[in-house]
């Protein structure tokens, strides 16, 4: 798949430089004392959340990352230069885990957030440090400390205000294409969307929100069926969910059973997902068969206190009312003018 949302990499901070063994050798000072300088500190590994990145593709292509080594100390009390830090710019929303223990090390959930992930090794002390009244000419120095290293797994979770949820081919891609600048691949067959698509939706009075078109889910998704649980995690950070249903296939397909099946998958993957607010959308209201079937499914949702918004992603019918509802949930109220 072209969207890289998970990658395993090896990172290493810089080794410290070695201390120097050196003695003053100057004219008229035949027995000069020790003047070996310290080694430089190794570079740190730093991770920073960048709002300008959206994938982990670069790290997939370069899975081994290493900070600079500290330079060795030199004579005349000259210390080695510090190793260059390795600054890894990552998309906002990247979660960094230890690849072996699965421990979460860093959650880069804010733009500009910067964390020192691995510290560089300390530089070794030169022999000038070890001169004493009992040993005025030490002939030894410290080696530099090795840097830290570990295998990491990076996961990128989409930072979206609204997530589009539903079985394959119910019209999620068509809706996000209609109301945002996103242009996902659209066709009338399952799993057209093979990656999460983000779209920025412009609302009234210059307000906007981010919508995520999540690939279609099927029963067993929490166990990896279909496109698998790798996409369920993209829903975890969305503030609200739009659950899109296609009732044009009744009675061959039961949209209410599909609705329950998807919510079951959410609960099995993460119980908190099933508790997120959902807006129920009936797509393709421009089709006569959908208008006929609408009366059959409405009581189901009315009994559960859920609002239903019939729309057409093809013609735009019903979309203004849907966006007003999203705005009410995001900001507490909808704007008066569309």
From Swiss-Prot:
MF GO annotations: GTP binding; GTPase activity; magnesium ion binding
Species this protein is from: Geotalea uraniireducens (strain Rf4) (Geobacter uraniireducens)
Location within or outside the cell: Cytoplasm
GO biological process: ribosome biogenesis
Keywords of the record: Cytoplasm, GTP-binding, Hydrolase, Magnesium, Metal-binding, Nucleotide-binding
Subunit field text: Monomer.
All copies of domain Obg, residue ranges: 1-159
Cofactor: Mg(2+)
Ligand binding (GTP): 166-173, 191-195, 213-216, 283-286, 312-314
Source organism superkingdom: Bacteria
GO CC terms of this entry: cytoplasm
Encoding gene, per UniProt annotation: obg
Name assigned to this protein: GTPase Obg
């Amino acid at each position: 798949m072209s969207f890289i949302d998970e990658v395993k990499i090896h990172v290493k901070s810089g080794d410290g430089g070695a201390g120097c063994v050196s003695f003053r050798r100057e004219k008229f000072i035949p027995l000069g004392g020790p003047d070996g300088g310290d080694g430089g500190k190794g570079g740190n590994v730093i991770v920073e959340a960048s709002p300008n990145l959206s994938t982990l593709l670069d790290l997939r292509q370069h899975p081994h990352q290493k900070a600079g080594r500290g330079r060795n100390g030199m004579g005349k009390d000259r210390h080695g230069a510090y190793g260059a830090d390795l600054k890894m710019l990552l998309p906002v929303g990247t979660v960094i885990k230890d690849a072996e223990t699965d421990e979460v090390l860093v959650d880069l959930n804010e733009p500009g957030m910067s964390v020192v992930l691995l510290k560089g090794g300390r530089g070794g002390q030169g022999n000038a440090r070890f001169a004493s009244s009992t040993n005025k000419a030490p002939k030894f120095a410290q080696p530099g400390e090795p840097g830290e290293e570990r295998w990491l797994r990076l996961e990128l979770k989409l930072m979206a205000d609204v997530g589009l949820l539903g079985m394959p081919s119910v019209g999620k891609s068509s809706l996000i294409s209609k109301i945002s600048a996103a242009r996902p691949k659209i066709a009338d067959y399952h799993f057209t969307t093979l990656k999460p698509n983000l779209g920025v939706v412009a609302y009234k009075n210059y307000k906007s929100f981010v919508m995520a078109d999540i690939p279609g889910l099927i029963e067993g998704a929490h166990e990896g069926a279909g496109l698998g649980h790798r996409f369920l995690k993209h829903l975890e950070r969305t503030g609200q969910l739009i659950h899109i249903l296609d009732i044009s296939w009744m009675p061959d397909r039961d949209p209410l059973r599909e609705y329950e099946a998807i919510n079951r998958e959410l609960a099995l993957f993460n119980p908190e997902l099933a508790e997120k607010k959902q807006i129920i959308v009936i797509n393709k209201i421009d089709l006569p068969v959908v208008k006929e079937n609408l009366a059959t499914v409405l009581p189901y949702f009315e009994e559960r206190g859920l609002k239903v918004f019939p729309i057409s992603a093809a013609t735009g019918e019903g979309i203004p009312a849907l966006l007003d509802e999203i705005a009410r949930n995001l900001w507490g109220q909808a704007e008066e003018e569309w």
